[in-house]
């Protein structure tokens, strides 16, 4: 059937003129494309009222909904006009034949169906156009995003290319074996591709780009080969190290030289001219005192190895006439030893000449009761007496070597020793040996009557020459330290000199040590709460001496009176 025959029954319908419809190409035409389609070409007038006032609303079918939901319906909406005409022609042909045969009622129903079909077609075309328009907008947005991404990637590729060229230049310069590498060339377009930032991701692998799909590992930094140093620098370093070592050694020697004397003073042996030394022991420190050395024979070597630790003179400050008088304990011992030595010599001469040898056994000999001697004997006995005393009589300017430099106040305005044989008197003895005559070991000096002392002396005289005297008289003028100690040059006293008398041959040397110096309790009664001696003047002191480590002897010494020379 020809196309004009199909459209003939619809000639009486009120369609718009044909010039208003656009020319749509067929579905099989290759000239149809998205660029040739324009939504403005579809111009329909929806103001025409196609429904009668009493007509029911049209019912949408599944075909219209399926056409609205499928994207192919939008693409094929251009050919909806031809299909609609064909459908209307197919449906109108039986209705027309029916109307011709049946009557006018069937013609009204066909007209209503035709109008409903047209409305559905127009709604489907409108929805198709809306979907196409939305799809085109989405495509345009994607194109814009892709263009921005392409521009960004192009800039990154340019930066990577410039960085690659710079790295190649640096590698070429480093391979020149020490040759100065030229500076890297400036990029051709610095404003177009700036230097890459550390947070920029690597370039995307795009089709046709020079970026490899597999990442290239980083090249290891090649350090230039270190040239060997000349030997001159090594020699300088060696000299510098040797100099520093020498300075350190000198500094160490200086420090040791400063510390060793201090350590010796603290823990080692030290001596002074006063003749006192400290002997360290596990029980404490013992003060040993040396006596005069003039009685030692020249054949004995006076220089004996010394092993004392510290010089500690026995000093005591006592109030006297409103001043503090310094008492040297060494002088006390030397004075007592000198007086005993002198009295021992005088008593020996007295035994030979007069036969009056009586004297108390434990008393301190005072040269007042000695029998008169001949002139020659007196000269021999008085020879060297000044050397045995602590200070020789005279103007006070003579000093002995073993006494050392005494204080100035000690020798000013004094013509004799401060403590001589007439100033110190033995009070009592305390013997530690268990074979003492007394039960308590105390031997008083004045145990017998004073009136008949001379008779007792004469009655107790020995018949022959005295070989060993049972008293505390010593045979040597120098003090001997305690047993087991050799700190005061006393080893040479183990063999007595030959020039001594036979009466002294069997005697053993004894040691005298000052134990304490006490004040008279009757004069020092005014004391404070701490037991200190008051500043009042004292006229008498008591000196306790340990003899031979077995006997304590207490002496009462009278202090000299006030002189015109100030003390201390």
From Swiss-Prot:
Segments of this protein annotated with the region Disordered: 1-29, 45-134, 479-510
GO cellular component: endoplasmic reticulum membrane; nucleus
Classification via Pfam families: bZIP_1
Entry keyword set: DNA-binding, Endoplasmic reticulum, Glycoprotein, Membrane, Nucleus, Transcription, Transcription regulation, Transmembrane, Transmembrane helix, Unfolded protein response
Transmembrane portions of the chain: 241-261
Coiled coil: none
GO biological process, one term: response to endoplasmic reticulum stress
PROSITE patterns membership: BZIP, BZIP_BASIC
InterPro entries, per the entry: bZIP, bZIP_sf
Compositionally skewed regions (Basic and acidic residues) per UniProt: 103-113
Domain bZIP: 111-171
Induction conditions: By dithiothreitol- and tunicamycin-induced endoplasmic reticulum (ER) stress response.
Comp. bias intervals (Low complexity): 1-13, 60-78
Domain of life the protein comes from: Eukaryota
Side Lumenal, residues: 262-568
Molecular function per GO: DNA binding; DNA-binding transcription factor activity
UniProt membrane topology term: Single-pass membrane protein
Region named Basic motif: 113-144
Family, similarity comment: Belongs to the bZIP family.
Function: Transcription factor involved in endoplasmic reticulum (ER) stress response. Acts as a ER stress sensor and activates the transcription factor BZIP50 and the chaperone BIP1.
Protein name (Swiss-Prot/TrEMBL): bZIP transcription factor 60
Organism: Oryza sativa subsp. japonica (Rice)
Protein's gene: BZIP60
